[in-house]
Amino acid sequence: MEETQQELTQQLKELETLMAAINLDDSKKKQPIYQNSSESEESETENKNFIYDFSSEEDFEEPVKVKIEEEAETSNKRKFDKNPEFTRFKYQKIPKEYVPAHQTTSTIGVLDIDCVANTEKIIKEWFNHHSILITINEELKNLSSLDTFYYLVYKTRGIAHAYLSNLPSEVLSRIPADRKQVDDWVYNLLLREFVGRLERPESEEAFSQNNYYKLINLEICNMCYLENFLCEFQSRYYGINPIDRENLKVDLLLYAKLPEYVRTQVEAYFNASITSNKLDNTLGGRITALKLWQTEQCNQKLAKRQASVGLCCSKIEDKIGKYGCRKSNPRAKKPKKKFRKIKKYPKKNFWKWNNQRKKKTFRKKRPFRKQQTCPTGKKKCQCWLCHEEGHYANECPKKDNKKAQTLKLIFDLGFEPVESDIETDEELFELTSEDSSEDEY
């Protein structure tokens, strides 16, 4: 009997372990039971540091745990942002992917114009790069027009890739049969969609007038910003239609924008260089004449002090070197003490809180002496107690004689003290007078 009971208990234990291993209900997951509270807390912190990473396409794939390691923070202070936006308003940090930026030519092979400020320039550089590849590369020469289109789509990403890969069938049917014209067709599509430019003279004229308007309003007041001024002037100048540039004589605006003390001298220098056949009458010749005149003015010894202030000679790139010519002035050099800067934290002054509302306010009065009862200072005033002259009330001799006053009042009323012995109570209330006699009683 005992052996059978032991076998039954072993079988029951095995069944319990099997039932615990099998999940009868997938929706209800049992949490593990921990012996100590410390083990449970450690497991909870580990589970928080794990995330499940799996794709929605693979439904039957088990989730993979990926541990996230948190970076140790030295302080609780917020990190400094170099480019805070809208300083006049409430601070709001903008994600980097949504901040407009000027893209460089390092990623010219793939077109990416997401949140880019110079969209037209990037599309133009990308078009020039791939138009040469399509004509030179032997492998790309054998592609059809449709394959060339898909190759150009492959070389894009972001919003440009989303636009070209989702073109309707009506637009795709207009792909030119000649593979050499596919890149021009794609380039015009991108300009029309992301810049708004059309292949029509009206559109070109509108963009030309916009550049001319910006060029007219361009100004420079400080010669230290000459390079920035010339860079923007050139970009606006070559954005204007060549016919309009000649008719409007836009190149003359370069010297007209300069400050007054520079304009007349630079024009005279440029005209002299043209007559001597040193420079050509182009925009590049005018810029070169301006820079040459600036260097000559800065190198003159007489006007050196004036030129260094007005022409910003310190920022000239093409300078004449003077190596080892600067004389040292020992008097100007002062020995500097090397010391370690110690941060001083100012002590906070704890002021006692004082509520000014609770204070009573008093008007300022003119100081004066209190009027005396006897202004002469002599004792001729009447006493308040006895109504007699010759002394004050505080010196009155009758001030403390209250008993004498009461006795006087009693005698004035006709009462006299009883001197004889009283034998009975009736004698106490007996009234006597001088005129009365003993027979009347």
Swiss-Prot record:
Alphabetical keyword list: Capsid protein, Host nucleus, Metal-binding, T=7 icosahedral capsid protein, Viral penetration into host nucleus, Virion, Virus entry into host cell, Zinc, Zinc-finger
Origin superkingdom: Viruses
Family annotation (SMART domains): ZnF_C2HC
Renumbered zinc finger spans (CCHC-type): 381-398
Motif Nuclear localization signal per UniProt: ranges: 77-79
Presence of keyword Ribonucleoprotein: no
Region: Disordered, residue numbers: 26-63
A biological-process GO annotation: symbiont entry into host cell
A Gene Ontology cellular-component term: T=7 icosahedral viral capsid
Pfam families: Caulimovir_coat_dom (PF22909)
Disulfide bonds: none
GO terms assigned for molecular function: nucleic acid binding; structural molecule activity; zinc ion binding
Keyword match Zinc: yes
Stored InterPro entries: Caulimo_coat, Znf_CCHC, Znf_CCHC_sf
Its biological purpose: Self assembles to form an icosahedral capsid, about 50 nm in diameter, nm, composed of 420 subunits of the viral capsid protein. The capsid encapsulates the genomic dsDNA. Following virus entry into host cell, provides nuclear import of the viral genome. Virus particles do not enter the nucleus, but dock at the nuclear membrane through the interaction with host importins.
Name by which UniProt lists this protein: Capsid protein
